Amino acid sequence: MKILLTGSTGYIAQRLLPVLLANRHEVVCCVRDRNRFNFEKYNSPSISVIEVDFLKPETLRAIPVDIDAAYYLIHSMSTSTGDFEKMEEASAINFRDYIQQSKASQVIFLSGIINEENLSKHLSSRRNVEWILASGSYSLTTLRAGIIIGSGSASFEIIRDLVEKLPVMIAPRWLNTVSQPIAIRNVIEFLSGVLLNKNTFNNSYDIGGPDIMTYKQMLLKFAAVRGLRLWIGIVPVMTPKLSSYWLFFITSTSYSLAQKLVDSMKVEVICKENDLKGMLGIIPVSYEDAIKEAFERIELNQVPSSWKDALTSSTLYDGISKYAEVPVHGCFLDYRKRLITHPEKVLLKIWSIGGKNGWYYGDWLWIIRGFIDKLFGGVGLRRGRKNQTEISPGEALDFWRVLIADRRAKRLLLFAEMKLPGEAWLEFRIDDQNILHQTATFRPLGLWGRLYWYSVLPFHGFIFRGMIKNIADG
């Protein structure tokens, strides 16, 4: 069967895609920028990639009309823009209007659990999207999930940040809100199980794990699984804004996402009973086992997707290709080169940069820069990296975004997502003469940009000099 997969670079789609291919489906992947999609790693003739932006109806003509079903996995929660509800509504309308002209008999939509009239903006937007999709001429199957637990999921990584960094927590009262977490493995089983299953047509289902817990209990259970001590005190007067700052400064989330999460976490998300898991033969994974499975993936360096790879920079929203061509004019440069004797070792070191491995020189200065970035509302250094030795275009790498990761050409190009009065690139390249080239490029924005460059210039002298030396030494 021919399946359309939207949001193909996203957390859920990257987990679902290998399952669809294993089930011998032909999959058409929709992406805004094909350079963010690592096509080669799948090595399958059953996959094709098309560039589609559902906010731009004219781009939808790239979608083939002979599809049998479509997954709607488009989500605007991570965007920094304030009108994400309008973006989600427009995307859903454009999707519906085009898909109902195709041969698709089913659309599958992954939403959030909706069981209260007083919904958060996020859940209200999800419900509105469901209504729009349900008005199409195809059959809609909606799966509503709560907290998703898996390596790289937003909920898992935020809980991990809190538990591993704060042995004592003074926390807001929404930690007493009840939720029903679900393992990412079960989510994928449900998504693949309902595909072209006529018993699920024009139905909606809440999906969750076997455990109903407060967020406080989830944190304590996580600590117990990891063998960590944790004490949590609840403060009833912590405002939503203060709660958002609490999440923002302690975890790797952006402030805009923290606001939306706090808004949603005040609402109980408990599944309404249904027979879907019995119909599909799915065995729910406990919260504890979901945590253990996530860490098994992390320890084996097998994290196929991460929520941190979602674009948080409005600058890059239209695609990374535009910034893959590093500007030459009107820029400041810090360029260094060094002859190397072991290019493969050096290349491995370049491909392992950031995250737990650090930046090979002056890590404490990078940490300070990341902290300053957080203070000004940036992403900071806490995003780390998904895989310790592999890297792909579009991935987040601390406060950088990977633009080019071409191992054959021995070139890595990064774009800064930190708060800056301008735009910055960092490039590593090994040429045919075994010379390592390291170039930091900064395109200033006005007078403040120029003042910024000269203020950090003294630090560049020894940071970049030490960095290239330690990389070149292999």
Name each region found by the language model.
Residues 131-152, 158-161, 165, 170:
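Conserved beta-loop-beta element that borders a ligand/cofactor-binding pocket
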Residues 415-459:
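Beta-strand/loop substructures that line and gate deep hydrophobic ligand-binding cavities in soluble
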Residues 2, 194-257, 268-334:
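Mid/C-terminal beta-alpha module of Rossmann-like enzyme folds, strongest
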Residues 35, 39-102, 112-118:
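NAD(P)H-binding glycine-rich loop region in Rossmannoid oxidoreductase-like domains
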Residues 3-25:
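N-terminal Rossmann NAD(P)H-binding glycine-rich loop of SDR-like oxidoreductase domains
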